Amino acid sequence: DGLEFLRKLMPQYPMPVVVISALSEKVFDAMKAGAVDFVAKPAVADRKQLDSFLCNELPVKIKVASTARVSRYKKPVMFDNNYSTSSKSETNLIAIGASTGGTEAIAEVLKNFSTDIPGTVVVQHMPPKFTEMYANRLDSQCRVKVREAKNGDIVAKGEVLIAPGGDEQMSVVKIADNYQVVLKKGERVNGHCPSVDVLFNSVAEAAGSHAIGIILTGMGRDGAKGLLKMKKAGARTIGQDESTCV
């Protein structure tokens, strides 16, 4: 099948691959095998949706994927485990953002999280419905609890909340001693909804120096300005090493 073909193709002839997939967990196996990105398969019966897919979404994905450094896909993401107890006590919130190639990078980071890690919020650019499946997959692989975020969720210690794909932007606000998720319909920012910049900007305002911002692999600029805002607010900021990025 296509997945097995991809597993044999990439080690011998690395090339940019965009997967067109129905709602299935196999898409994440394809990403692990080296695919650069994926798009949700459109409903063939819906001519308007099909035209939009063929004329807009798919060409953009292919254009972006064509610039990917696929020869590096086999390099593992190394997570620095030198996360001291003192750092944990000072950090109340972690925010992670990723785009193209980010599904596996996020998984590698979260697998290193212990159950006492500060509450974590994540934006990974992904189509609607896939985010819940992705969260469930991560939950089965990690020590921390991972699930898709819902409006009003409290960001709790040892828990990771994944922003749902769709038409809602995810931000975080501080209420008393807690950080709360806000999901609100909004315009695309940097071409994305949810947007990493929207999340990072809100974390900078809500948590300031008590937050950590992590930007992982991606092909665009989403998250760059937000991470800078977090840094200026006193947060610790971390970026994935270029050699392991797509």
Language model region names:
Residues D1-V246:
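Conserved acid/base catalytic micro-environments in cytosolic active-site loops
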